[in-house]
A protein has these predicted regions:
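N-terminal Rossmann-like dinucleotide-binding module
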Residues: 2-50, 54
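Residue-level detector of anion-binding/catalytic polar loops
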Residues: 61, 90, 139
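Donor/substrate-binding cores of folate-linked one-carbon enzymes
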Residues: 29, 95-204, 208
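N-terminal glycine-rich "phosphate-gripper" loop used for MgATP/nucleotide binding
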Residues: 44-45, 68-69, 73, 87-103
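Conserved acidic residues
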Residues: 40, 90, 111
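Short, well-structured alpha-helical segments in soluble
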Residues: 78-87
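Short, surface-exposed acidic-centric catalytic microdomains
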Residues: 35-79
Length: 209
């Protein structure tokens, strides 16, 4: 399965649930033509969040699909899929999107839907990755960009960055340093995928030709 590398900037749809700091990193990067990608739209699962406000200030189209507005999760998943599809993305980026997508979304965007995680997967998956790494006593942790699949933080790894753990670290301090690394890693990974394309073979993701 190969994607990308065509002429013209890659089209991104970015999904958010909160403040949108990873989105802002992508918006800032996309202001440079050499980045090779543009944010075509920003979607959210709730209204009134800073992530949507960031997009609106940048003149980016936005949409909201709230789970509570649909009779079941499958209906929400189809609606989210249709909304994202309407912007013809080359790559879909979860930038702090806190909902698990379903079969319709993965069928449409499998192999081109990426997410970040604040640990070195497959170690410490789930919502408490930073705390779990600190509690375990590891000397290094970090962040991962990965392809989303039907599991929780189980998709193929695309890129990782290491963050040392300090003796005096607490969860909040360590998480802040991981977030800095995560933003840089996400921007670098999207840039590489947009410019060089990517392919997925089983659990192996190759970026560039």
């Amino acid at each position: 399965m190969a994607h990308g590398g065509e002429a013209g900037p890659a089209r991104l749809v970015v999904l958010v649930s909160g403040t949108g700091t990873n989105l802002q990193a992508l918006l800032d990067a996309s202001a440079e033509p050499a980045f090779g990608a543009l944010v075509a739209a920003v979607g959210a699962d709730r209204a009134g969040i800073e992530g949507l406000a960031r997009a609106e200030r940048a003149g980016i189209p936005t949409f909201t699909r709230r789970l509570a507005d649909y009779p079941d999760r499958a209906g929400w998943d189809r609606a989210l899929t249709d909304a994202v599809s309407s912007y013809r993305p080359d790559l879909v980026v979860s930038a702090g999107f806190m909902k698990l997508v379903g079969p319709a979304f993965l069928a449409a965007f499998g192999g081109r839907f990426i997410n970040t995680h604040p640990a070195l997967l497959p170690a410490f998956p789930g919502v408490h990755g930073v705390r779990d790494a600190l509690d375990y006593g590891v000397k290094v942790t970090g962040c991962t960009v990965f392809m989303v699949d039907a599991g929780t933080d189980t998709g193929p790894v695309i890129a990782q960055a290491v963050v040392p753990v300090r003796e005096d670290d607490d969860v909040a301090g360590l998480h802040e340093r991981i977030k800095v690394a995560e933003r840089a890693l996400l921007v670098d990974t999207v840039r590489a995928m947009a410019s060089g394309g990517w392919s997925v073979q089983g659990r192996k993701v190759k970026v560039g030709r």
